Amino acid sequence: MASLDSLPAMKLVRFILSTLLVTSVNSQTQCRNFKSIISFGDSIADTGNLLGLSDPNDLPASAFPPYGETFFHHPTGRYSDGRLIIDFIAEFLGFPLVPPFYGCQNANFKKGVNFAVAGATALEPSFLEERGIHSTITNVSLSVQLRSFTESLPNLCGSPSDCRDMIENALILMGEIGGNDYNFALFQRKPVKEVEELVPFVIATISSAITELVCMGGRTFLVPGNFPIGYSASYLTLYKTSNKEEYDPLTGCLKWLNDFSEYYNKQLQEELNGLRKLYPHVNIIYADYYNALLRLFQEPAKFGFMNRPLPACCGVGGSYNFNFSRRCGSVGVEYCDDPSQYVNYDGIHMTEAAYRLISEGLLKGPYAIPPFKWSCLSSEIMNKMSLDTQILDEQLLQGCLKV
């Protein structure tokens, strides 16, 4: 009779227990089994792609001071005073900061590659134009980013087997993406009901991208929802009203804009639940950007921010220090002495201090669903179970063929 130790089930139990022990010993290294980061999205994750794609005679605002002042001490193409959420995730995983793919010469993409472009939309610009929504910053939509990734695989990883191994062992950041689809519409004062009509199209596009990457071998995805945009200085300026009923009496946000974000996030989570059922062997983590940021506006002093968290650090004019025609990075636009005291950096994007707290809420707190550490553990288990991986690959192929 075979010993209990020879049984696959017991070996798996022993492995899980040993992994849990190692994880509990050092929480800072709990996710180091990921080999790289692959990122798609917009300005929330752009580490320099829009800058790399731009004409030297027509550079984006992120190419000019004070962007980058806090951590890098010079502009890097990031729309913040310092690091972004993707940067803090990379540091947590023990990786170098993820380099931008576009326009980046001699970059080392072994530990990560970033296709996120500031101004990018989930939907094609032509789709938005047909609905009277003008997107003029970039045409590098989510599908274009995904196509760039697919076409670059021979240079990133070489052989098909090496590429599949890279994708399987990567943490794939799917966004934030989709926010600009709504921003461009709302900045044009489109009725919110009309903006809501975009939601199923945006979600279907994100879902399709995840499915395509799953079929390429993707096993772990971090998919963010939208921020509570009712706290954005840009929207508070654009939609300023004397009707006090539209504002939250405690925080001063525009309630209807936050309601829209909640509506979108709920629909996105329902779609992710469907994908989890279709691909039970894949870790699809919802990143709750909404609540991770919301707490900073609700209790600013608790997190080290000044008691007026709504105005932008960098900007000019009005109650919220924001003006669409004189934005951060423009000549003569002032900026605060200490960005770490602000949540809002330029009226649209957050400060490094805010992004740090959001990242900690995802990596160590309750704002990743399921919790981030368990997703890492699942990835480690799958890496150790070669036989089961072959079975899952067969199931995956069947699932992809049904799509």
UniProtKB/Swiss-Prot annotation:
Glycosylation site list: 139, 323
Alphabetic keyword roster: Glycoprotein, Hydrolase, Lipid degradation, Lipid metabolism, Secreted, Signal
Recorded family membership: Belongs to the 'GDSL' lipolytic enzyme family.
Alphabetical list of SUPFAM superfamilies matching this protein: SGNH hydrolase
Keyword Lipid metabolism recorded: yes
Cellular location(s): Secreted
N-terminal signal peptide: 1-27
Listed GO MF terms: hydrolase activity, acting on ester bonds
GO biological process, one term: lipid catabolic process
InterPro entries the UniProt entry points to: GDSL, SGNH_hydro_sf, SGNH_plant_lipase-like
Protein name: GDSL esterase/lipase At1g28590
GO CC terms in record: extracellular region
Its EC number(s): 3.1.1.-
Cystine pairings recorded for this chain: none
Active-site annotation: 43, 346, 349
EC main group: hydrolase
Source organism, top-level taxon: Eukaryota
